[in-house]
Amino acid sequence: MDRAGRLGAGLRGLCVAALVLVCAGHGGRREDGGPACYGGFDLYFILDKSGSVLHHWNEIYYFVEQLAHRFISPQLRMSFIVFSTRGTTLMKLTEDREQIRQGLEELQKVLPGGDTYMHEGFERASEQIYYENSQGYRTASVIIALTDGELHEDLFFYSEREANRSRDLGAIVYCVGVKDFNETQLARIADSKDHVFPVNDGFQALQGIIHSILKKSCIEILAAEPSTICAGESFQVVVRGNGFRHARNVDRVLCSFKINDSVTLNEKPFAVEDTYLLCPAPILKEVGMKAALQVSMNDGLSFISSSVIITTTHCSDGSILAIALLVLFLLLALALLWWFWPLCCTVIIKEVPPPPVEESEEEDDDGLPKKKWPTVDASYYGGRGVGGIKRMEVRWGEKGSTEEGAKLEKAKNARVKMPEQEYEFPEPRNLNNNMRRPSSPRKWYSPIKGKLDALWVLLRKGYDRVSVMRPQPGDTGRCINFTRVKNSQPAKYPLNNTYHPSSPPPAPIYTPPPPAPHCPPPAPSAPTPPIPSPPSTLPPPPQAPPPNRAPPPSRPPPRPSV
């Protein structure tokens, strides 16, 4: 299948890959609850079918079957290779699950026999890896080799050489040794000692290492954060997955971005951990561009593919949000202006409301006990005896006498009766069916409700204060206008009495009054008006014509003398 078909199959598995975001450990779990791997790479099983495993081939088959079912990525390809005197490829590299099922059936029918030529199996694997790389795919490869015996010196040399050749092509080599194996030989054939899985308890114990093999051999990419970026902006991506430190050298780990299935850009990560990578990402300038995320464990020699796609979108600079907030604040300001403007522009005079009528103490419905006050027999006030006036009882309050008692003078022989109980508790009210109303139990939210009610009352009072001041329909008024009135004659500042020796002193400003009209001498009893004092140096007030007085009606107006 070509690369485009493989990518299409990977896109179909996008929904499956999204489920692993909630999984932990080695990547995820299958429907039956067992561990699973979602990595997209090429997996090669190289199995020993020499005569030493003749009676244990069923255990080997079930081990391979269980392990193969744990790799469930649609992008994973698998191949079965057996070796004895020579190597045979039972199933070539494929991701077709039906072909994998048929390959497992062929594997079950294998009849073991022959010598242990492990290098023959590595040769068959290297041939396929080389062919796939020549096609331009460069997919990461994982080899799991199983044997049960010790290799002779020459066979060990050839096996190590072919394993190194597979590594040079980008493969990661794991070895499984059963019972009578040489662990030192397998450590040199595999990538390291950590890549060797010993099974000392025989072939029956192969099922117990499936989880360990899956955890160490699985290299998977589960997610990328962020998955959507802004076009034309630089960013960093966090690659979530497993097995990123399984490489022989973590310094050779690379993040790869395949843009629109055409251009591949490799970036060295800032941090490499077993479960995540922190990588710089290339700048995608156009909206709608897509970058498929890949990881290389060998400095770009081969890549582990995934279904994780990073897309670009258009991002605003925040101006729309700023404009929206500005419009919102303007609307709020207009609403406040509409509410408070009539308070500034309308003068309203309202009648003083009548004083509130004080409620009687007897009508107190708060349910609190009422205090009893001493009573005084008022028959002894001013009546000179018991039959003097009508008997009247007066209640004395805690701040002195009540209004009735304040009008009377307490007599010496007044009888004061103290109440038996200081407080009088109200009787419980009965319902229509003569049943008493049960007291409401205190809820857990009662304190919170009380505080909220108090806050609501405070806000309501503030609203009512402003609402009362607002003009009602029909109220009239006008705004206060401040205007400047221009005077026709500017005011003159009075002259100061400053002495200038070079100039003569100015003459006092004085205008003699007009001659008084001739009037008959007044009666002797009338007092003589005082003589006006001479004017001072200050300027006199502005002269105005004397007011015209109307003559008495009993005599004609006087004539002026000639």
Curated annotation (Swiss-Prot):
Residues 400-420 have a biased composition (Basic and acidic residues). It comes from the Eukaryota. Residues 42-213 form the VWFA domain. The modification Phosphoserine is found at residue 360. It is found in: Cell membrane; Cell projection, Lamellipodium membrane; Cell projection, Filopodium membrane. InterPro entries: Anthrax_toxin_rcpt_C, Anthrax_toxin_rcpt_extracel, VWF_A, vWFA_dom_sf. It is a single-pass type I membrane protein. Residues 341-562 are cytoplasmic. Residues 400-442, 490-562 are annotated as: Disordered. Residues 31-319 are extracellular. One of its GO terms (biological process) is substrate adhesion-dependent cell spreading. Glycosylated. Disruption phenotype: Antxr1 deletion results in viable mice which reach adulthood without defects in physiological angiogenesis. However, histopathological analysis revealed an excess of extracellular matrix in several tissues, including the ovaries, uterus, skin and periodontal ligament of the incisors. Residues 490-500 have a biased composition (Polar residues). Glycans are attached at residues 164, 182, 260. SUPFAM superfamilies: vWA-like (SSF53300). Residues 1-30 form the signal peptide. The chain crosses the membrane at residues 320-340. The keyword Zinc does not apply. Interacts with gelatin and type 1 collagen. Interacts with the actin cytoskeleton. Plays a role in cell attachment and migration. Interacts with extracellular matrix proteins and with the actin cytoskeleton and thereby plays an important role in normal extracellular matrix (ECM) homeostasis. Mediates adhesion of cells to type 1 collagen and gelatin, reorganization of the actin cytoskeleton and promotes cell spreading. Plays a role in the angiogenic response of cultured umbilical vein endothelial cells. May also act as a receptor for PLAU. Upon ligand binding, stimulates the phosphorylation of EGFR and ERK1/2. Belongs to the ATR family. This is Anthrax toxin receptor 1. The lineage of its organism: Eukaryota, Metazoa, Chordata, Craniata, Vertebrata.
